[in-house]
Design a protein with these regions (language model features):
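Formylglycine-dependent sulfatase
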Residues: 2-8, 21-277
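Bacterial N-terminal signal peptides
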Residues: 9-18
Length: 277
């Protein structure tokens, strides 16, 4: 199975996360592929967006349950992910910000992957599932029966290394950030990535690179490997967390070329509201 076929096989439940199941002939426990997509709003054909080019998701939606009335209880990444993965509202989790650790305030809280682990599943994750600022080690170790795959364990397409700052593969952007990094080293700065990003962090990148050069492509490739390596004697819960379309809007050129810039309509509202609630 290659990464593109893997991506085409995903069934999306559009908000934060997606769930698909297939059944083991041996024990009839469903194998579960759980997919998290960061900041994906319903600009999708199956949600009525006529401009969006989303044929694979649209096709999958024909046989899926599409939710049209979803409510976000707290529009902060860490809080919403903890709420979703525990089934508890933020007033119960006590995670309202981007720094509170979930188990510091709820040591015995039961998470979704932990529930499956407790019921005989092999549980493993890759990519962004929890917000790393809200859990220990960026992954919540108790949730997984197999060590979580971190970003530093990912491999990228031949000829490409880890994206600069975690985001950039374009030659010009990498060159600017490399110059800033050397500048930071010469100054004795400790947090090199912060120094770079404070001075140069483009909101998008259009680079003619393969899918596997960017983080999401590498995550998809690793997910395929994990599926092939699963213990077939046990059911699995595999969580795959993609980072895009959260800012910065970085993607290979072939995806940008699906749209003509002159046909893209700007959002009607482009300034902050005067009296936000």
């Amino acid at each position: 199975m290659n990464a593109m076929n893997f991506l085409k096989s995903l069934v999306f439940c559009f908000f934060l996360t997606t769930l698909t199941t297939s059944y083991s002939q041996e024990n009839q426990k469903p194998n579960i592929l759980f997919i998290s997509v960061d900041d994906l709003k319903p600009s999708i054909g199956s949600f009525g967006d006529e401009f969006a080019v989303t044929p694979n998701i649209d096709e999958l939606s024909k046989d899926a349950t599409v939710f049209l009335n979803n409510q976000n209880q707290l529009a902060i990444c860490a809080a919403s992910r903890v709420s979703f993965l525990t089934g508890l509202r933020p007033d119960k989790t006590k995670v309202w910000d981007l720094k509170t650790k979930m188990r510091d305030v709820n040591p015995e809280v039961l998470t979704l992957p932990e529930h499956f682990k407790n019921n005989g599943y092999q549980t493993i994750g890759v990519g962004k599932i929890y917000d790393p600022r809200a859990v220990d080690g960026g992954r919540d170790r108790r949730s997984w029966s197999v060590p979580f795959v971190t970003q530093n364990q990912l491999t990228f397409s031949d000829g490409y290394s880890f994206p600069s700052g975690g985001f950039y593969q374009g030659k010009e952007n990498r060159a600017v950030r490399a110059k800033l990094r050397q500048e930071a080293i010469d100054k004795g700065v400790n947090n090199l990535n912060k120094y770079e990003s404070d001075r140069f962090k483009p909101p998008y990148e259009n680079a003619d690179v393969p899918d596997g050069a960017y983080m999401d492509g590498a995550i998809a490739n690793r997910a395929v490997e994990l599926l092939d390596q699963m213990d077939t004697t046990k059911p699995f819960f595999l969580a795959v967390g993609f980072l895009r379309p959260h800012l910065p809007f970085n993607a290979p050129t072939k995806y940008w070329n699906l749209y003509k810039e002159e046909e893209v309509q700007l959002a009607e509202f482009q300034t902050k509201s005067k009296n936000p609630v």
